[in-house]
Amino acid sequence: MRRGKKVGGIVLIPYSAAIAVEQSLEHLWEQILERLQHQLSRPTFETWIKTATAEAFDGKVLRLSTPNPFARNWLQKYYLRTIADVAAEILGHGIELQIGVLSDTSAEPESGAELWPAISPPPAVEVVKPPTTTAGRPPLRSSDLNPKYVFSRFVVGANNRMAHAASLAIAEYPGREYNPLFLCGGVGLGKTHLMQAIGHYRLEIDPDAKIFYVSTEQFTNDLIAAIRRDSMQSFREHYRAADVIMVDDIQFIEGKEYTQEEFFYTFNSLHEAGKQIVLASDRPPSQIPRLQERLISRFSMGLIADIQPPDFETRVAILQKKSEFENMPLPRDVIEYIAARYTSNIRELEGALTRAVAYASISGLALTLANIAPVLTPPTEKMELSPEMILQTVAETFDVSIEDLRGNSRRREVSLARQVGMYLMRQHTDLSLPKIGEQFGGKDHTTVMYSCEKIGQLRQSDPQMGKQLQEINDQLFVASRG
C-alpha cells in the first residue's frame, strides 16, 4: 500500500491516490442522493439535499457543505440522521456526518471545530413522503387553493431563496421553527404562491389538517358578520381551531383597531398552542402604519423573509417553466425579450408571456419576436378605439348584451361588466366622465368615477381581474390594428 510522504508535518497524498479518494467521494454522494431522492418529497430533496455538496470523506467522517447557514441548521436538525443512515446502508458501517457552510470553506480555520462542528445525530426523524392524492381533503377557509401554486412550480432564485426555504421548512414541520413566518415583498413577487404551496404540502401529508388561507379583508368581514349576528364565540372558536393559518395582505389591518384587537388574541391563542402562523405583506411589520406595537412585536418574533424582484436569469427560468407547464413553447429570443423588459414583478412577467401567446393566436401570426414585439412594447399613445368597439368587446367577454350594459340590471355579472366597460372607456378614449355615463344609458358621472376607482383597485389586488383586463386589452389592441 502506498503511503503519503510527510514533509514539514504535512502528509502529501500521491496524485493517483487523491484522484481515487475524489472518485470514491463522488460515487458515495451520488448513491446517497439517489436513495434520498426516492425517500423524500421532491421539494424537500431539491431544497435541502440536492443543494448540499460532499467535501471530504476519509472512510469514517463525511463532510458536507450547504449554501448558507440556514440550510446547514435545517439539515443538522431534521435530516442528519436520515443522511447518516443512508450512508451507513451503502457502506455497511456507521459514519460520522459533519456539515459546514460552503461560503466558509475557502478559508479553513486552524481548528476544524468552528467550520466542521462535531454533531451528535438527533433522534431519528420519520421521513414522510406525501401521498399522491388528497382524497377527503376538507374545504379550506375561503376557497380552494390555486392548483398552480405548489412548490414544484415555484422558481427559486437569489431574490427569494430564503423565503422559499423557510416556507418549505414550516410546511414540513409546522409550528416548530419560524413562527410566525412573515413573507415580505412587493406586488406579484410570489408571496401568495408560497403561502398556498404551504397549504398544498400540508394537505398532501395530512388531508384532515385544518388549513386556513384568508385575506385580511376576509378576516375583517367575518369579524363584522360575527358582531352583527352576535356570534363572536363561534368566530373565535372557528379561527382558533386552525392547524395552519395564512393571512395575506396583512398590511390592510392598519387602522382597524377592533380587527387588530381580535387578531392579537387569535394570534396568541394559536401561537401558544404551537400552531403555524404565516403572514404576507408588501412591507415589514415596522413599516405598517397605525399598527399596534404589540402586533409589530408579535409579527417580528419569528422570521421575516424578504422577497426581491427576480434577476434576469431567474426571470428567464420563470418564463421557461410557465411555458412548459402551460404547453406554450416559445423561442429563446422571445423569452429573453420578455425577461429583459418586464423586471418589476412576476405577475407582469407572466402576463406578458400570456399576452404574447394570445396575440399570436388571435391575429393568426407565427410566434416570432418580430410579430409579438408590438404587443409587448405597446405604443404610449392611446389606441384608436371607439366606445362601440369597447362595448362590443366587453359584452362578448362577459357574455352579456350591449343593451344589458346600457340598462339598469343589478345582476352581479352585468354590474361588473358595466364597471369594466366604464374603466376601459376612461383608459382608452378622451371622453369625459359624463360622456362615458351617456354611453352606458345615461349613468351619473359619480357612478362612472366609482366604477373606474373600483376596477382600478381590483386590477392591483385581484390577479384574476388583472388577467381578464389584459385579455380584453389584447383583443382591443388587435381590433385597433385591423
Swiss-Prot record:
ATP binds at G188, G190, K191, T192. Residues 144-360 are annotated as: Domain III, AAA+ region. Residues 96-143 are annotated as: Domain II. Changing R298A: No strand separation in vitro, wild-type ATP binding. One of its GO terms (molecular function) is lipid binding. It is found in: Cytoplasm. Keywords: ATP-binding, Cytoplasm, DNA replication, DNA-binding, Lipid-binding, Nucleotide-binding. Oligomerizes as a right-handed, spiral filament on DNA at oriC. Belongs to the DnaA family. This is Chromosomal replication initiator protein DnaA. It comes from Synechococcus elongatus (strain ATCC 33912 / PCC 7942 / FACHB-805). The gene is dnaA.
